[in-house]
């Protein structure tokens, strides 16, 4: 029984260790903004505003994902606050992600949209 208590203490310590960063970041909020609809061949432009923390105060990447109707999530790309970008190879030629640390925002531009780009778009950290 004593051994079980020791194991439980270690488990709780581990859980607290894992959960602590999430408590600290729980106030962070991301809000997408942009047009609801874009016509074929046009450029989709979306902005994500970060509140509850500075976009440049952490070593995290900020990104965009999308979910087409009836399908799973698809990663579009990510950006570091310094401007380093990484894009989904299948979208790379049409995607630009940029960051504006003065406004605490990062943005997505997807050019030459088609019906295949129909999806719900999300910003994420």
From Swiss-Prot:
List localization entries: Secreted; Cell membrane
Region annotated Complementarity-determining-1 sits at: 52-61
UniProt entry tagged with the keyword Hydrolase: no
Segments of this protein annotated with the region Framework-2: 62-78
GO molecular function annotation: antigen binding
- Residue ranges for the region (Complementarity-determining-3) are 124-125
**What is the protein's name according to its record?**
Immunoglobulin heavy variable 4-39
Q: Which organism is it from?
A: Homo sapiens (Human)
Gene for this chain: IGHV4-39
């Amino acid at each position: 029984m004593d051994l079980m208590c020791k194991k439980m203490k270690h488990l709780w310590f581990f859980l607290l260790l894992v959960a602590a960063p999430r408590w600290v970041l729980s106030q962070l909020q991301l809000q997408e903004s942009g047009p609801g609809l874009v016509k074929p061949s046009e450029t989709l432009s979306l902005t994500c505003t970060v509140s509850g923390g500075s976009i440049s105060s952490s070593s995290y990447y900020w990104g965009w994902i999308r979910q087409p109707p009836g399908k799973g999530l698809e990663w579009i790309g990510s950006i570091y606050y310094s401007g380093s970008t990484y894009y989904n190879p299948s979208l790379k030629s049409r995607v630009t992600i940029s960051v504006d640390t003065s406004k605490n925002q990062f943005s997505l531009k997807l050019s030459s949209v088609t019906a295949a780009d129909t999806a719900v778009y999300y910003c994420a950290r």
